[in-house]
Amino acid sequence: MANNMVASPYKNTFMMIALVLILLISGSEARSNGIYDPMCPGVCGNLVKPDCNGLCHELGFPAGGYCKPGNTCCCKKKDSGPVDVPPTA
């Protein structure tokens, strides 16, 4: 009777492998559909931290991140001009 209560280690291993495969397949499908946009790196909302402006600043974008419909946080384009480097003494 006690043997029926113990889960087979093979069953647990199979379930873990199946879960990992499902997550990998669904993630690659989302990326292949062009959903990811580097200008819109996150989500936004009242309870989301950091806010869009803070997230964009942390990722190296200029200040002024905004929340577009669908709760997607988007950033302003980075300047492609020369970077001001302060002189060292």
Curated annotation (Swiss-Prot):
Gene Ontology CC: extracellular region
Presence of keyword Chaperone: no
Transmembrane segments: none
Extent of the signal sequence: 1-30
GO annotation terms (biological process): defense response to fungus; killing of cells of another organism
Disulfide bonds: C40-C75, C44-C67, C52-C73, C56-C74
Keywords: Antimicrobial, Disulfide bond, Fungicide, Plant defense, Secreted, Signal
Family that this chain belongs to: Belongs to the DEFL family.
Protein's UniProt name: Defensin-like protein 78
Record organism: Arabidopsis thaliana (Mouse-ear cress)
Species classification: Eukaryota, Viridiplantae, Streptophyta, Embryophyta, Tracheophyta
